[in-house]
Curated annotation (Swiss-Prot):
UniProt subunit comment: FixA and FixB form a heterodimer.
Family under the similarity heading: Belongs to the ETF beta-subunit/FixA family.
Keywords linked to the UniProt accession: Electron transport, Nitrogen fixation, Plasmid, Transport
Pfam families xref list: ETF
Protein encoded by which gene: fixA
Cited PANTHER family: ELECTRON TRANSFER FLAVOPROTEIN BETA-SUBUNIT, PROTEIN FIXA
GO biological process, one term: nitrogen fixation
Molecular function terms from GO: electron transfer activity
Superkingdom: Bacteria
Protein name, entry field: Protein FixA
Job description of the protein: May play a role in a redox process involved in nitrogen fixation.
Species: Rhizobium meliloti (strain 1021)
Amino acid sequence: MHLVVCIKQVPDSAQIRVHPVTNTIMRQGVPTIINPHDLAALEEALKLCDTYGGEVTVVTMGPKMAEDALRKALTFGAHRAVLLTDRHFAGSDTLATSFALAQAIAEIGETFGTPDVVFTGKQTIDGDTAQVGPGIAKRLDLQQLTYVAKILSIDAASREITVERRAEGGSQILRTGLPCLVTMLDGADAIRRGRLDDALRAARTKVVKWSAADAGIAEPANCGLRGSPTVVKRVFAPTSREQKARQIDTTNKPLREIADGLIAAIFADRPALKHDLGSTGQQGAPDVDRES
């Protein structure tokens, strides 16, 4: 079984800072991590490999420093790592990113064997779009299972996979044929501790580095800014709002008087609310017959 896992190196969101003047993200000095949802995908792929055998290939698109994320994935137990790096990829939005990764996965299939399952995280913590995984599936014509919490089983004979998928209000048990693409949720299983032999093997393993041409991308115009119909116009910090607290003495006061005082205080801070409520005929506190 051949499992391909897409990962991304992202800034540690707990330590991201925004420049107070330019309102841009200050990346200098901010440590990077593997996207948490991608770690969940990697762990699920490694578990399948433990159960059914096979190999796990990790792939990422990014600058040369993204090799650090791939080497970390190798220490967890991945067998092979591919870095897709080229100046043509700079400024890629989700459409251009899914195109480049789909081309790379197709090339991985030609070079190392067709993937049975392609894994991605549900989304990245620096983009939060959840679009790249489905975009890859569409380009590779793969069935897609999104928001997956757990892989329940793989039937090698019938070439089918069964998963538990989170849905609004509960969970779904879904089954589809292989090959397919799965987007994993963070939190299902923590990434394993790498073993010593995995760390030693990772140190000896050479990361495969592909340019756009190496990945079979004949037309770089589909990549990077040229292939991106969307561009981030501005990154900004939310404006702070002064919060006020008001203490009201309710000692030995009837409920009606307390309610009227609270409503008057709210209307004093938000005059527009009084106008809106007045237009619906809802003014003042409701009648209170008794205290309870």
